[in-house]
């Protein structure tokens, strides 16, 4: 499966509305136009109405609704409110700082806070690689505890299910594949593997600790005599800290030239999270991923 296949999967889910917080950005609007064309999605755009009317002048009236906002903070609040009141299905980050958007998301009155940990799931389409790779969490949780890691992994499993991988293989990553009490990542990874065996993590297969090479390469796993369903075949890479995840994320983009879609999950609705450096195509993939993930919230 490739990221472009998400377009077909998302297009099955008709009449989804995406609320875009502070959509005053040409690349964001390009992605909005592509999504309106290919996904039959509708958009609620918050921001300066004059600028947004100019940017969306070529779109049909039924495809877009514009809600005026004077500041990024107001834009974020209005977009989140629309999802909170179920007039939109998905929230999308526009030209607004992530911290501002998340402040609105976590508002106790009209936000999207749930009992779950919020976490970031990135889905990579890597050239010459035979499957999509899910990486979590490279953007939200700095140094998650064991219980937070369990929830982060479970969030990623829900996203994998949403795109059609019904039993993903998850590798709890560390620097080495043996347990070392002085290396917390190896201890947590081993605990997660045991939690899976005891039924505390569902909908996937978990192993760890695994180093990156023997998680994704069957050759590397065989050389180190590491066996099991996950070794060499991982779909989900659960990183121990935000530093490890962020470096892996950017390495895949800048060195491996991977395409990426990203979503924040664990809230009451999925959040398509894109960076300003993302192309319109990658933003489109994130919208498609969030639409697919939104179906998990209805079941």
From Swiss-Prot:
Q: Which domain of life is it from?
A: Bacteria
Its top-level enzyme class, in one word, is transferase
Function, as annotated: Catalyzes the conversion of butyryl-CoA through butyryl phosphate to butyrate.
The record ties this protein, via PANTHER family, to: PHOSPHATE ACETYLTRANSFERASE
Annotated EC: 2.3.1.19
Any single GO molecular-function term of the entry would be: phosphate butyryltransferase activity
| Sorted UniProt keywords | Acyltransferase, Transferase
The protein here is known as: Probable phosphate butyryltransferase
The species this protein belongs to is Bacillus subtilis (strain 168)
Q: Which NCBIfam families match?
A: P_butyryltrans (TIGR02706), PRK07742.1 (NF005837), PRK08190.1 (NF006045)
The UniProt similarity line reads: Belongs to the phosphate acetyltransferase and butyryltransferase family.
Keyword Acyltransferase applies: yes
Can you cite a GO biological process for this protein?
butyrate metabolic process
Q: Which reaction does it catalyse?
A: butanoyl-CoA + phosphate = butanoyl phosphate + CoA
